[in-house]
Curated annotation (Swiss-Prot):
Source organism (scientific name): Maize streak virus genotype A (isolate Nigeria) (MSV)
Keyword annotations from UniProtKB, A to Z: Capsid protein, DNA-binding, Host nucleus, T=1 icosahedral capsid protein, Viral penetration into host nucleus, Virion, Virus entry into host cell
Region: Disordered, residue numbers: 1-39
Motif extent (Bipartite nuclear localization signal): 1-24
Keyword DNA-binding belongs to the record: yes
Molecular function as annotated in GO: DNA binding; structural molecule activity
InterPro entries named among the record's database cross-references: Gemcoat_MSV, GV_A/BR1_coat, Viral_coat
Locations listed in the record: Virion; Host nucleus
Domain of life: Viruses
Function recorded in the entry: Encapsidates the viral genome into characteristic twinned ('geminate') particles. Binds the genomic viral ssDNA and shuttles it into and out of the cell nucleus. Plays a role in protection of the genome from degradation, virus acquisition and transmission by insect vectors, infectivity, and systemic movement. The CP of monopartite geminiviruses is absolutely essential for virus movement.
Listed name of the protein: Capsid protein
């Protein structure tokens, strides 16, 4: 029986392994990576004390992307901005007129995008075109058919409030207790992915008259006539883009 012997050269070739060099971590970094992106700017709108929001029957509409021209973090630095995220934190407190009655109501908050504001903020009735007979029922409102090309509802949230015919300072008799009700509620929302692009005129203020295209409104309406005041703040996360 014959056996074949491997040569030493064959053994040395057999033991050799082809190794591939791993690319360096520096080579994996690409231009425009997350680490290189500028951080979002923040604007905070506070409503408390004399600046609280009064929400009457029929609702209220406020411009919230009020980025004035400037160098601070909350200012726009260019002629165009992109609003990405919004954090909303408010206490809704039923007013004295509403507390006189035992009532419950479903209110609504919307974020509404206005493609062409035209220098003046609209009213909730302009946006939703509700008849007076539905003024107290905002959950039924829809954007006007004639203006659906202009107004776009980005977000919509419902909330419930109630009153029991008493105000918060009333004191129950010693032999009784009153069940708590939702005359004072905390409303919190955080939403992202808005992508609201705003083009600004060549002016320095941040009012609706300075917006050429792309206003963002916060619309709040009480349900069943249960009017209230709003105390808290709205924080907007945005970027300045486009030309100087």
């Amino acid at each position: 029986m014959s056996t074949s012997k491997r040569k030493r050269g064959d053994d040395s070739n057999w033991s050799k392994r082809v190794t591939k060099k791993k690319p360096s971590s520096a080579g994996l970094k690409r231009a425009g990576s997350k680490a290189d992106r500028p951080s979002l700017q923040i604007q905070t709108l506070q409503h408390a004390g004399t600046t609280m929001i009064t929400v009457p029957s029929g609702g209220v509409c406020d411009l919230i992307n009020t980025y004035a021209r400037g160098s601070d973090e909350g200012n726009r630095h260019t002629s165009e901005t992109l609003t990405y995220k919004i954090a909303i934190d408010y206490h809704f407190v039923a007013d004295a007129a509403a507390c006189r009655y035992s009532n419950t109501g479903t209110g609504v908050m919307w974020l509404v995008y206005d493609t062409t504001p035209g220098g003046q903020a609209p009213t909730p009735q302009t946006i939703f075109a509700y008849p007076d007979t539905l003024k107290a029922w905002p959950a039924t409102w829809k954007v006007s058919r004639e203006l659906c090309h202009r107004f776009v509802v980005k977000r919509r949230w419902l909330f419930n409030m109630e009153t029991d015919g008493r105000i918060g300072s009333d004191i129950p008799p010693s032999n009784a207790s009153w069940k708590p009700c939702k005359r004072n509620i905390y409303f919190h929302k955080f939403t992202s992915g808005l992508g609201v692009r705003t083009q600004w005129k060549n002016v320095t203020d941040g009012g609706v008259g300075a917006i050429q295209r792309g206003a963002l409104y916060m619309v709040i309406a009480p349900g069943n006539g249960l009017t209230f005041t709003a105390h808290g703040q709205t924080r907007l996360y945005f970027k300045s883009v486009g030309n100087q």
